[in-house]
């Protein structure tokens, strides 16, 4: 995923379906991992790759783009992502009740 070469856009405009964009994934600790993905690739692959590199289960993380949660079946094209866009990652928090 991250080793593929980018094809230059012939028209200099919008990305075509087969083209790649670079995405920056930023964790809660401000660590950055860069991914190069196709516009039509389901973001499930990026999520799985990120969680594998971090050594945590993918279901323990929440991925957000522009404040909206990213589901597995979405693609960068569907989300209107562009080169160098940022995906934020947060640890899933469960439980937590107040004791009064």
Curated annotation (Swiss-Prot):
Propeptide residues, per UniProt? 97-100
InterPro entries named in the record: Rad60/SUMO-like_dom, SUMO1_Ubl, Ubiquitin-like_dom, Ubiquitin-like_domsf
Q: Which GO terms describe its cellular component?
A: cytoplasm; nuclear membrane; nuclear speck; nuclear stress granule; nucleus; plasma membrane; PML body
- Please name the Gene3D superfamilies in this protein's record: Phosphatidylinositol 3-kinase Catalytic Subunit, Chain A, domain 1
A UniProt-annotated Pfam family:
Rad60-SLD
In the record, biological process GO terms are: cellular response to cadmium ion; cellular response to heat; chordate embryonic development; definitive hemopoiesis; protein sumoylation
Q: Where in the cell is it found?
A: Nucleus membrane; Nucleus speckle; Cytoplasm; Nucleus, PML body
The cross-link described as Glycyl lysine isopeptide (Gly-Lys) (interchain with K-? in acceptor proteins) comes at 96
Q: Which domain of life is it from?
A: Eukaryota
Give a yes or no for keyword Aminoacyl-tRNA synthetase in this entry: no
Q: How does it assemble?
A: Interacts with sae2, ube2i, ranbp2, pias1 and pias2. Covalently attached to a number of proteins.
Q: What does this protein do?
A: Ubiquitin-like protein that can be covalently attached to proteins as a monomer or a lysine-linked polymer. Covalent attachment via an isopeptide bond to its substrates requires prior activation by the E1 complex sae1-sae2 and linkage to the E2 enzyme ube2i. This post-translational modification on lysine residues of proteins plays a crucial role in a number of cellular processes such as nuclear transport, DNA replication and repair, mitosis and signal transduction.
- Protein name, please? Small ubiquitin-related modifier 1
Species per Swiss-Prot/TrEMBL record = Danio rerio
């Amino acid at each position: 995923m991250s080793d593929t070469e980018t094809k230059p856009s012939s028209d200099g405009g919008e990305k075509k379906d087969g083209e790649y964009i670079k995405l920056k994934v930023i964790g809660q600790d401000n660590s950055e991992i860069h991914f190069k993905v196709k516009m039509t690739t389901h973001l499930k692959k990026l999520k799985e790759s990120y969680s594998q590199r971090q050594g945590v289960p993918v279901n323990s993380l929440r991925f957000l783009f522009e404040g909206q949660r990213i589901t597995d079946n979405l693609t960068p094209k569907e989300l209107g992502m562009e080169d160098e866009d940022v995906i934020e990652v947060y640890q899933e928090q469960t439980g937590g009740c107040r004791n009064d």
